[in-house]
Amino acid sequence: MFDYLENEEVALDELKQMLRDRDPNDTRNQFKNNALHAYLFNEHCNNVEVVKLLLDSGTNPLHKNWRQLTPLGEYTNSRHGKVNKDIAMVLLEATGYSNINDFNIFTYMKSKNVDIDLIKVLVEHGFDFSVKCEKHHSVIENYVMTDDPVPEIIDLFIENGCSVIYEDEDDEYGYAYEEYHSQNDDYQPRNCGTVLHLYIISHLYSESDSRSCVNPEVVKCLINHGINPSSIDKNYCTALQYYIKSSHIDIDIVKLLMKGIDNTAYSYIDDLTCCTRGIMADYLNSDYRYNKDVDLDLVKLFLENGKPHGIMCSIVPLWRNDKETISLILKTMNSDVLQHILIEYITFSDIDISLVEYMLEYGAVVNKEAIHGYFKNINIDSYTMKYLLKKEGGDAVNHLDDGEIPIGHLCKSNYGRYNFYTDTYRQGFRDMSYACPILSTINFCLPYLKDINMIDKRGETLLHKAVRYNKQSLVSLLLESGSDVNIRSNNGYTCIAIAINESRNIELLNMLLCHKPTLDCVIDSLREISNIVDNAYAIKQCIRYAMIIDDCISSKIPESISKHYNDYIDICNQELNEMKKIIVGGNTMFSLIFTDHGAKIIHRYANNPELRAYYESKQNKIYTWKYMILFPNAIVKHNKIHKNIESVDDNTYISNLPYTIKYKIFEQQ
């Protein structure tokens, strides 16, 4: 009988005959099945009368077989294409619904005939809808992944214990999933995202004749039950970001899924692919889009609800591979949006001038904001700067950018040392070729600058910034271009003080001192030095320079410094006084070494015994650097002039002039 029930088309009369001498509750078979188990396992079990007969014959509807399944559990666990509602009801009624939780809701949902009335019966008699399947999906999660979920059944599930608002079990604060991104940075989203994610993903490539496409009514139903469409999954994707990959995109569904998303053009870099991702970025990228052609109405919708930076990030990576589509998109934008996108592009991206040209063609302009943006771009290059300044006219460099000097952005350290120095410079040699990208860019911009000493909101000049960021080549360029070393910032800081306190760069300090700051500037700088012990060498350089200007400055030097360096000041005084006593050709040794006029004429006295004796004595300890450089150069120049005089042909006009006149003629060359 059991074999018959399990494998044959069961006839009532034949079964009645068998039941006369067989016990339907005989469970001595290997599977411990009773007669109900055997019949309900039969793939042809569609006759409710057979079930009623077995029950009337005393078959126990609560007996559990080797799989610990009652007949109802066996029936709803079997791989039947359909679950017969009448059979299920008979089995439930036979136990007074005590076996209701033996009903396998997950298998039932996969059948082709889910009956809302049967679901209502389960609800009415207390079925536990909080149960989860082997894959840890809830009832509602499984149901939305079926072929054609019905909103009314979704309502029943949710209203009777199926939650669609998740809480992380490990989160002691119980933040709902939808609150993750804005309120709890430590919260990790569930792998599958929301129920809305599951529904969209499972119906992306559905064909209407076998499996339904995404149904707007289902989407509305889920949203109405509190699912936030802006929620993201572990891949940081919203449901909309998946939906735009669908084989059939309904713009009304797109609008539903946009709710709560304040920027449909938001973008991010995918960790695995290093590609720019996001709703708009994915849709424009043919690698993520199902359909070949772009729907411009859909793109316009994204543009209307997207922010310029995200739009820029979405279209720029695709420019080189799909110029036609991107140019078409640019053409559809209004000029205000396009202008914002141009500024974002110039500020944050590696510039392709051909893309800029397209933007300009469709209504954008290179204005002051665009130029200011490019000065902040870490991918700056002189060629693009030339192009942009010529388009704008160059006046933008003369206007502060939120209180900052535009060119000053290039002085900052985030542009990298390589932008200012070549390998030669790193090895100790100055690079003054301006071939370095940032330096050459600044060099190109300077002619547009009406006042190289323009100040920012802190009262600082470009020179202040170049010194602060230790850009020696740039400092040299600015000094050669007329930057004033004497300007004080709003807090009283000079470039000299910055070189000592912040840059701690003696070479920079000497460059500044060589451009002859005023005595007041040097004294003010000394007052600003924060550590008079650790900065001893720098302080001595300043004192040495200041005493050349005025050897009576000891009273002006801050008392803390003058006390600490009193012996050094005395030695400076002694050496300077000695140089002032030595007379060479009507000039003091001091004036020949430390004045501009002296530097121009010192070569005339290259053979002067007193000058040579002073040079060869090397008696100075402090003021040696100047004459140790000047005097050898003076000898070389003198010898060159003398050689030129000797080479003049006899019996010429010049040859007949006195030697002193000939000397003055040739020293001009």
Curated annotation (Swiss-Prot):
InterPro entries: Ankyrin_rpt, Ankyrin_rpt-contain_sf. Keywords: ANK repeat, Early protein, Host-virus interaction, Inhibition of host NF-kappa-B by virus, Modulation of host cell cycle by virus, Modulation of host E3 ubiquitin ligases by virus, Modulation of host ubiquitin pathway by virus, Repeat, Ubl conjugation pathway. Residues 586-667 are annotated as: PRANC/F-box-like. The keyword Repeat applies. Substrate-specific adapter of SKP1-containing E3 ubiquitin-protein ligases which mediate the ubiquitination and subsequent proteasomal degradation of host target proteins. Prevents activation and subsequent nuclear localization of NF-kappa-B in infected cells, by targeting NF-kappa-B RELA subunit to the SCF E3 ligase complex. Belongs to the orthopoxvirus OPG023 family. This is Ankyrin repeat domain-containing protein OPG023. It comes from Cowpox virus (CPV). The gene is PG023.
